[in-house]
Amino acid sequence: MKKLLFALVLLFSLTPAFAQQKNKVRLQAMYDSIKAAGILHPEFVMGQCIQETGWLACKKCCLRYHNLFGFYIKGNKCKKFTSETACIAYYKAWQDKRYLKWQKKHPKQDYYHFLKSVGYATGDKYTRELKPKVEWVKKNLRL
């Protein structure tokens, strides 16, 4: 029984790592698209994409609507996009509208603070979950 329990714990602990490696080519391509769009702080934004889509592998999230970043519209409904490219363009416009203005007022703050300030990150829990993903991006993708 202990061996079975150990095997299950091991299996579930390795599943995220397997998903990361399995999707690494797709994750790199997504990062490259984010960077090519001219989005600022692409490593953070890629971390958001990973957070919101479960490493680009979720089945019951906004990804089915090409929504890479968990944007919602009124009524708490997932915003739908025609393509991942359209979603990335939307993020770029969303960031352009907010970030530089915010940065002028808060020059010493980081992107985590920006996300919280504009209401994207709803609390400290989101930041705690996002940080390891951003670190993974910095360590494992070509920036």
For each of these PLM feature ranges, what is it?
Residues M1-K22:
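Bacterial Sec-dependent N-terminal signal peptides
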